[in-house]
Amino acid sequence: NTAGILDAYHPLLETDEALWDRIFAVNVKSMYRLTQLLLPEMLQRTSGTIINMASIAGYVAGGGGVAYTSAKHAIIGFTKQLALDYASQGICVKGIAPGAIQTPMNTADFAGDGKMAEWVANETPVKRWAKPEEVAELTLFLATPQASYIQGAIVPIDGGWLLK
């Protein structure tokens, strides 16, 4: 479950209900609906892996505006509760919390003079943005049998951002 959109870093008083609903529809409700659709089949097989894409914004403020940050917190809570509820039935549930990943979603950060992208890289302990392939490799590993004992964990891939 990896659908996600940003909210242009809007604080609460700049976030109308339509924006809030849109962020939650894409980031949270899509995850809920897809999981609800596929989970019965996984339970019937007593096997399955669900990987939800959260964000470091699900741990700390500052990775997005109020709607995005709230949605990413919701994803973490959903992931942990789902993991607890279905672990004994053979369902492995975990999440990934990316930090600064250079994707089309972050194109605006690189626009113009690119000061935002430069600032983010400088604030990240490893001093760079991650490539999407780095997140893909982590996702592939988490889907393997070798990662089957990882249950309910949210794995950060953030260049050390959460260390600060």
Named regions from a protein language model:
Residues 6-9, 60, 140, 151-164:
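Short C-terminal tail/terminal secondary-structure segment
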Residues 10-12, 19-21, 116, 120:
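Substrate-binding pocket helix/loop in short-chain dehydrogenase/reductase
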Residues 13-32, 47, 51, 75, ...:
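Catalytic Tyr-X3-Lys loop
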Residues 35, 71, 79:
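Active-site helix of classical SDR
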Residues 40, 84-85, 148:
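Alpha-helical segment proximal to the catalytic Tyr-Lys
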Residues 55:
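Residue(s) in the substrate-gating loop at a strand-loop-helix junction
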Residues 87, 92, 150-152:
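Short, small/polar-rich loop/turn modules that mediate ligand/substrate recognition or access, typified
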Residues 95-98, 115-146, 150, 157-159:
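C-terminal helical subdomain
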